[in-house]
Design a protein with these regions (language model features):
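N-terminal auxiliary segments of SAM/dcSAM-dependent transferases
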Residues: 1-21
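Membrane-proximal soluble helical/coiled-coil segments
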Residues: 27-139, 145
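C-terminal substrate-binding/active-site "lid" region of AdoMet-derived donor-dependent transferases
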Residues: 128-183
């Protein structure tokens, strides 16, 4: 039986590709989670209840599937995706180039001014949720919404929950920002 030896550079290439895709996992403990079709449909249903024009940001947009789909569905809105994994950012940026109301920024979610948006969407991990909640409370305007796919904010009941039941995605959890006197 003959053994095929792979060139050493293939292993290095594989490592570099994994690093370029999983950059967030190392620093932020947020792996790549892509929103499924049912989650996108539930987001579309929810956004159709909002007053246009709408400003929406996807924190950690991956390949921009969700933000691009929503931008196509709601042409009067402004849709922004932020991503720090280099390869995912490049793919997302290329996908959104021709969609006028969609833009992708190479930026950490912690550098985004959440007050610019009516809806802030994320599909992160349990690790950053409390920190994100503190950031949302400090920056988001009264009446704006924070939406998390699957991951709840510990100790903070959602104002609304939309069932997704698709693979590992269970629900969209929605919190409406209240005025400072109510927090």
């Amino acid at each position: 039986m003959q053994r095929a030896d792979l060139p050493a550079w293939l292993f290095l290439l594989g490592f570099v590709l994994l690093l370029l895709v999983n950059w967030n996992s190392l620093r932020e403990q947020v792996p790549l989670y892509l929103s499924g079709r049912k989650a996108q449909q539930r987001l579309q249903q929810y956004l159709s209840e909002r007053e246009p024009p709408l400003r929406f940001v996807d924190l950690g947009c991956g390949t921009a599937g969700t933000v691009l789909q929503l931008a196509r569905q709601f042409p009067r809105g402004q849709f922004v995706g932020v991503e720090t994994a280099p390869l995912l950012f490049l793919l997302a940026w290329l996908r959104c180039l021709l969609q006028e109301n969609c833009s992708i920024r190479y930026r950490s979610l912690w550098q985004v001014e959440l007050g610019e948006f009516d809806v802030v969407y994320c599909f992160l991990s349990p690790v950053p949720m409390l920190r994100l909640w503190a950031k949302a409370q400090a920056e988001m305007r009264t009446g704006s919404w924070l939406i998390s796919n699957t991951f709840e904010i510990p100790g903070v009941p959602a104002d609304r929950e939309l069932d997704v039941s698709e693979g590992r995605q269970t629900s969209l959890f929605l919190w409406q920002m209240k005025g400072a006197e109510i927090r």
